[in-house]
């Protein structure tokens, strides 16, 4: 075991004592993902599309899910598009899955994958096409029947069907399938799931040969996808524990031996950009194995999957602290996090989503750049001849550039620090203009261009912007240590609820009326904030303050 683990075990002892701990400064780059499961409509869709009304209902369901994810600063959606040799899009290779129309093989009347890509990109999120590789559903199901009719090797185990990984044609087939998605859709990633031998499979070859068979599929997919669009991220979801460690056993359930998934070797060989190990475990079955993944990442991205479903009392007995401790440790290890499944996160089971919103991912984050493929920064954008216009209580910014994406930063100080994630207000923005609320105080804006690989340009920095008309004087509030003093006239007034908002109007914290005239700033990141109060006449801006570290 490397030295990192020795320090890690000492560190985790401290972490274990208290789950409610501050997460420190948020990282600017980090994968924050969810698995959006479509099999049986587990996460989506929740209704069938037979008519135009049914189509709109399905679309509305997805829009609401994505709105919640955007609000929680999730930046990656892993959408299941190959389910059981069936699809969530029109394909010349495989039939429609029945989750969308209710009838296997029948179109729902629109393209769910294309719609999801468009909606994710509108919200600054990546969409990765989740491809279930080996399972083909029931032996007599439409997916397995289609594979057999097309001459593919399908193995029957009981009533279930599986694509045979030991036949070279299987690798070619999956490679062609993924190439079709990469060619026809603006996906940001191809995500391989169940890229392993099934547990029920009687292995008649050596483990070394079995691992070579699975690696052949991975290598083929990587080659085919990168030949079409080299910026598409190829990832997989291996079993959560890679192999036995010197001090900790995997108890027979690991990627390398049980699943014949040499995923760390794929990272080292450079045929995998990201891995999402399914780490649905606790304690010593989680922490040392997470550190092992990071130690053997070879500069690629590791995003442990968290068992959010165990928070549901019908599925497990986990408490919120079981997940929050894991989130905290992953943040310290510079790893991302992914929730399985989406619904357990968006439904805020045991308060997970609200906790993540407030303490973990309060600010947006960019995903890590594909630096092993490109490191050259793109050209910076430039302001238009009239870079800003003030219209009532709105400021419209406009710029010009050649990159597919822009990242927007806002601050009360100049130049805007683009290394500080707290200044990020929009990521993967695709338009050349942005409307900001005019808060009656000068603000500063920075815009960077970003290419397909995630490389950022140098920042285009702005001048300060003055409101269009003089407003009432806003008091500067007293902030001492980690408490904000509420003015006496306010604390004695009819304000029952308070909010802290950032410089662009986003709500950072909400409070009930303080009993002693002070509002706690514990866990509030350092920065500039407005204090708002709610009376019978609505929300009122009560003052401004700057919360900073005191020596």
Feature locations, PLM:
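Active-site-adjacent "subsite" loops/lids of carbohydrate-active enzymes
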Residues: 29-31, 37-59, 118, 128-184
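Substrate-binding cleft of secreted/luminal carbohydrate-active enzymes
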Residues: 263-264, 268-286, 300-375
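C-terminal tail/sorting-segment detector
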Residues: 468-471, 526-551
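Aromatic-lined carbohydrate-recognition surfaces of secreted/lumenal glycan-active proteins
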Residues: 126-138, 191-192, 210-256, 301-305, ...
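Aromatic-lined carbohydrate-binding/catalytic grooves of carbohydrate-active enzymes
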Residues: 70-108
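Pro/Thr/Ser/Gly-rich low-complexity, intrinsically disordered linker/stalk tracts
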Residues: 358-402, 454-468
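Beta-strand-rich modules
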Residues: 436-456
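Catalytic domains of carbohydrate-active enzymes, especially glycoside hydrolases
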Residues: 57-86, 184-188
């Amino acid at each position: 075991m490397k030295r990192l683990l020795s320090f890690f075990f000492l560190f985790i002892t401290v972490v274990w004592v208290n789950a409610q701990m501050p997460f420190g400064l948020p990282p600017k780059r980090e994968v924050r993902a969810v698995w959006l499961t479509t099999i049986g409509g587990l996460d989506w869709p929740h209704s069938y599309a037979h008519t135009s009304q049914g189509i709109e209902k399905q679309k509305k369901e997805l829009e609401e899910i994505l709105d919640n994810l955007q609000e929680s600063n999730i930046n990656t959606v892993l959408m299941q598009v190959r389910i059981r040799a069936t699809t969530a899009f029109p394909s010349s290779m495989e039939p429609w899955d029945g989750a969308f129309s209710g009838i296997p093989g029948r179109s729902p009347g629109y393209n769910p994958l294309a719609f999801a890509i468009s909606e994710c990109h509108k919200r600054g999120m990546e969409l990765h096409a989740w491809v279930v590789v080996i399972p083909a559903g029931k032996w007599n199901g439409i997916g397995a029947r289609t594979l057999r009719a097309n001459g593919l090797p399908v193995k029957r185990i009981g009533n279930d069907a599986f694509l045979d990984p030991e036949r070279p044609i299987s690798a070619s087939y999956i490679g062609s399938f993924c190439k079709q998605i990469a060619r026809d859709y603006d996906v940001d990633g191809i995500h391989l799931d169940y890229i392993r031998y099934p547990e029920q499979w009687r292995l008649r070859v050596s483990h070394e040969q079995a691992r070579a068979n699975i690696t052949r599929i991975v290598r083929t997919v990587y080659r085919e996808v990168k030949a079409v669009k080299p910026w598409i991220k190829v990832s997989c979801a291996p079993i959560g524990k890679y192999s036995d460690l010197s001090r900790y056993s995997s108890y027979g359930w690991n990627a390398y031996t049980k699943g014949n998934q040499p995923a760390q070797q794929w990272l080292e060989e450079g045929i995998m950009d990201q891995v999402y190990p399914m780490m649905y475990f606790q304690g010593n079955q989680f922490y040392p194995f997470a550190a092992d993944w990071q130690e053997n990442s070879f500069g690629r991205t590791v995003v442990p999957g968290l068992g959010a479903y165990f928070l549901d009392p019908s599925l497990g007995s986990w408490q919120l602290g079981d997940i929050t401790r894991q989130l905290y440790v992953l943040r310290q290890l510079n790893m991302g996090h992914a929730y399985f499944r989406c619904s357990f996160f968006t439904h805020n089971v045991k308060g997970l989503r609200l906790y993540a919103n407030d303490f973990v991912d309060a600010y947006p984050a960019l995903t890590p750049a594909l630096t092993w493929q490109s490191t050259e920064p793109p050209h910076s954008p430039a302001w238009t001849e009239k870079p800003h216009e003030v219209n009532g209580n709105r400021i419209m910014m406009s710029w010009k550039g050649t990159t597919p994406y822009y990242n927007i930063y806002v601050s009360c100080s100049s130049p805007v620090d683009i290394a500080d994630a707290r200044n990020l207000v929009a990521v993967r923005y695709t338009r050349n203009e942005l409307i900001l609320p005019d808060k009656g105080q000068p603000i500063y804006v920075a815009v960077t261009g970003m290419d397909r690989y995630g490389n950022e340009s140098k920042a285009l920095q702005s001048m300060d912007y003055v409101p269009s008309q003089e407003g009432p004087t806003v008091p500067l509030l007293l902030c001492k240590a980690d408490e904000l003093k509420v003015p006496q006239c306010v604390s004695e007034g009819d304000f029952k609820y308070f909010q802290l908002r950032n410089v662009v109007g986003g709500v950072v914290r909400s409070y009930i009326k303080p009993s002693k005239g002070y509002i706690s700033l514990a866990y509030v990141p350092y920065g500039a904030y407005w204090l708002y109060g709610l009376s019978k006449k609505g929300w009122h801006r009560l003052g401004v303050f700057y919360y900073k570290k005191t020596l």
